[in-house]
Curated annotation (Swiss-Prot):
GO terms for cellular component: protein-DNA complex. One of its GO terms (molecular function) is DNA binding. Gene3D superfamilies: Periplasmic binding protein-like II (3.40.190.10), Winged helix-like DNA-binding domain superfamily/Winged helix DNA-binding domain (1.10.10.10). Required for the induction the katG gene for catalase. Involved in the response to hydrogen peroxide. Residues 8-65 form the HTH lysR-type domain. It comes from Mycobacterium xenopi. InterPro entries: LysR_subst-bd, Tscrpt_reg_HTH_LysR, WH-like_DNA-bd_sf, WH_DNA-bd_sf. This is Probable hydrogen peroxide-inducible genes activator. Residues 25-44 bind DNA. It holds the Pfam family LysR_substrate. It comes from the Bacteria. Belongs to the LysR transcriptional regulatory family.
């Protein structure tokens, strides 16, 4: 009979999932980077704590019991959740790792991308950059919906509800030939 307060260990769940996938103790142990004895102990502890046999062993074969087949998707879901939690924690401590979805307006892309991409893989090997080129309004909508992490846009733009950080200010001038009607004006209407 299982102890109702039993909490499976991650080692036990990983051992169970690996043996189920590999259907071989040696291969499962190798995949987890442990020896066979450690793997067997972790699996035995899980089975004992749950009060059910998960794996049947024969001289030639390893296979799941009906209970093992029923519980395997739950074990995998727990392991995926723990792995996602760990990855999120790593990403939270280092915002320059993981995935960055960057939006750019088409007029900026040819100027910004070569500078941004040059040496990026060497400087930030844990960062995966995905670039989306679109118009300002659609980029802002994608930011608000969570489809982008950041966007380089031109102002003025409606950025309420977002953080907007100016990165540079560039003056543009209109060059005209001598005698043009707009020549000598301080502002272009």
């Amino acid at each position: 009979m299982a102890d109702k307060s039993y909490q499976p260990t991650l080692a036990g769940l990983r051992a169970f999932a690996a043996v189920a996938e590999k259907q071989h103790f040696g291969s499962a142990a190798s995949a987890l980077g442990v020896n066979q004895s450690t793997l067997s102990q972790a699996l035995a502890g899980l089975e004992s704590g749950l009060g059910v046999r998960l794996i049947e062993r024969s001289t030639r074969r390893v296979f799941l019991t009906p209970e093992g087949r029923q519980l395997l998707p739950h074990a995998r879901a727990v392991l995926e959740a723990v792995d996602a939690f760990t990855a999120a924690a790593a990403g939270a401590s280092d915002p320059l790792q993981g995935s960055l979805r960057l939006g750019l307006i088409p007029t900026m892309a040819p100027y910004v991308l070569p500078t941004v991409l040059a040496g990026l893989a060497e400087r930030l090997p844990a960062l995966t950059l995905r670039v989306v080129e679109d118009q300002t309004e659609r980029l802002l909508a994608a930011l608000r919906e969570g489809a982008l992490d950041a966007a380089l846009i031109a102002l003025p733009a409606e950025t309420s509800g977002l953080s907007a950080v100016p990165i540079y200010d560039e003056d543009f001038v209109l060059a005209l030939p001598p005698g043009h009607p707009l020549s000598g004006k301080r502002r272009v209407p």
